[in-house]
């Protein structure tokens, strides 16, 4: 798992306070969503950074080769039941994992239930990250595991202190979404070299 970089929100202190952004490259967001929770966060990403920067793709009806058109990518991966991928990701992941993703910079966020499924919290983050790393992608934006209460997670990096990406819990910690997303957006600006006006 040497393709995980050192960039982390631990080093980000300043909040996102501006609303107009510029980027030399388009950023794609690939998501799967049954309940609409993940899709709502993806819509928020596009609304915050702008439609001229963010392209949204629901993996249920997206050609896997579309990911090859972007170097900067955001992956949304909710965890279902006992550590399973969301149903559309079950089919989509093997297809993109078979592609050459060298040079692709990927930031991830996952959604899970740390109380109802404490042994599988954010497992999808780890499942997807490992496959993308094997395909040559670089995973950026590790997220501190402090502030969550769970038993086990495949979403944890080998250091045991960070997730492969942002973790959101709609069922138990929705009141923390705003503060977590604000720090995460600040990290995105750095990772993807997005400038703010």
What annotation goes with each model-predicted range?
Residues 52-63:
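A short beta-strand-loop structural module common to alpha/beta enzyme folds
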Residues 32-36, 61, 79:
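Short, surface-exposed acidic/glycine-rich loop or hinge patches that mediate macromolecular interfaces
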Residues 28, 57, 171:
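Short, flexible active-site loop motifs that bind/organize anionic cofactors or intermediates
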Residues 1-25, 37, 48, 52, ...:
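FMN-binding flavodoxin-like domain, especially the glycine-rich phosphate-binding loop
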Residues 27-44:
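N-terminal beta1-alpha1 ligand-phosphate binding loop
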Residues 66:
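Short conserved loop adjoining the S-adenosyl-L-methionine
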């Amino acid at each position: 798992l040497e393709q995980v970089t050192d960039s982390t929100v631990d080093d980000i202190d300043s909040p996102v306070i501006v609303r107009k952004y510029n980027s030399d490259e388009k950023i794609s967001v690939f998501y799967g969503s049954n309940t609409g929770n993940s899709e709502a966060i993806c819509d928020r990403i596009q609304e915050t950074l702008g439609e001229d920067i963010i392209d949204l793709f629901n993996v249920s009806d997206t050609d896997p080769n579309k990911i090859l058109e972007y170097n900067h990518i955001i992956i949304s991966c909710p965890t279902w039941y006992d550590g399973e991928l969301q149903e559309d990701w079950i089919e989509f992941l093997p297809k993109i994992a078979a592609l050459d993703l060298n040079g692709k910079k990927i930031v991830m966020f996952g959604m899970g239930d740390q109380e109802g499924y404490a042994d599988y919290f954010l497992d999808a983050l780890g499942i997807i990250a490992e496959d993308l790393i094997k395909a040559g992608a670089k995973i950026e934006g590790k997220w501190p595991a402090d502030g969550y209460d769970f038993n086990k997670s495949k979403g944890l990096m080998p250091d045991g202190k960070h997730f492969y990406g942002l973790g959101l819990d709609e069922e138990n910690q929705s009141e923390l979404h705003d503060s977590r997303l604000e720090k995460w957006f600040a990290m995105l600006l750095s990772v993807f070299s997005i400038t703010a006006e």
